[in-house]
Amino acid sequence: MPKLLTIAIPTYNRAELLNKQLAWLAQAIKGFEDDCEILVSDNCSTDNTQEVIQKWQATLNNITFKSNKNSKNLGVVKNIMYCLNSATTKYVWTIGDDDPIQDRAVAYVISKLRGHEDLSLLFLNFSGRNQITGEAVHPPTIVGNRWFDIDSEDADGDGKAIFEHCFSKSVGAVIFLTATVYRTDLVKRALQIWPDAENNWISLAYLAGYCAANGGVIVTKETYLECVVGVSYWQKEPKSALLMQYKHIPEVILKLQENGYSKQFCRRMLLQNGKEVNWKVFLGALRRWPMSAIKTVVPFVALVSLCAFDVMVSKELKLAESSEISSQEMRSYEP
């Protein structure tokens, strides 16, 4: 009989942090050994990551502990996708090797997975902290230091509507890896539908949206972990901000529309993204990589312009329909 949950850790050249995270997991998982499997996927590290994995495999010999070492560095997103595709349990929870998680999180997750047979997605609320200043960080549209502002712990709401709310409030919230537990069969199906998701840094939003549209969703009110802002893998990539804002987010929105989300919602999200992009990012990229920047931004501008035109036409049609109805009503009252 398959176990309930795979807790997967993708890692690369962070042996010390991995050791600390596995030490946390060894304590947090006590009492749930029969429900869980552990998977560590090493993205071809050159430090002593393998020694750390072997040490903890020997220590945690009462639980299924799988490990993988890629023959080359696949990049962080592909390593995450490997973890998701390799899970054989009903649910998969892929966690960062450096994210601070509360001890009670594992027990909470297991209890919710056991209690809701049709659950397809679980978001653990989290707080944010700036790595340099230590100051609290959270979306400006949300009050208090948390990243989700919807309370949905009974899993009986409209999963699609819950995801739409969360996504519209904060893209960052729905792509925070450690905050998300997916139902394995759904996340694998989503990856089969869009194989190129592994080349999109925002694709975790698509995976969450797909799962949300196909079952129950839980979003916790309390926070169970912390996101340290300023250490993300994509922030180290030179073109990351340009690609994420002008290419990857629009791609995800279009994929959501292809997989059941309304045209109205996706159009609204594209227009919202058009308002929120930082044009300084484009201007900076234009100086450094002119051709690449232009090739990235021109399709984005065309897409947002098309959405804006579509909205204008819809408003004109509604206005015309309203005027026609009013005229008919006036004629009906004529003597």
What positions do the PLM features span?
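Generic detector of well-ordered alpha-helical segments enriched in charged/polar residues
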Residues: 160-164, 188, 250-254, 266-267, ...
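Short, flexible coil/linker elements and helix-boundary hinge sites characteristic
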Residues: 26, 61-62, 114, 192-195, ...
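Acidic carboxylate-rich catalytic motifs and surrounding loops in phosphoryl-/glycosyl-chemistry enzymes
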Residues: 124-126, 222-224, 263-276
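Membrane-interface aromatic/basic loop that binds lipid-linked glycans or pyrophosphate carriers
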Residues: 270-335
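Nucleotide-sugar donor-binding/catalytic module of glycosyltransferases
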Residues: 1-241
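Non-membrane alpha-helical secondary structure
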Residues: 45, 238-244, 258, 270-274, ...
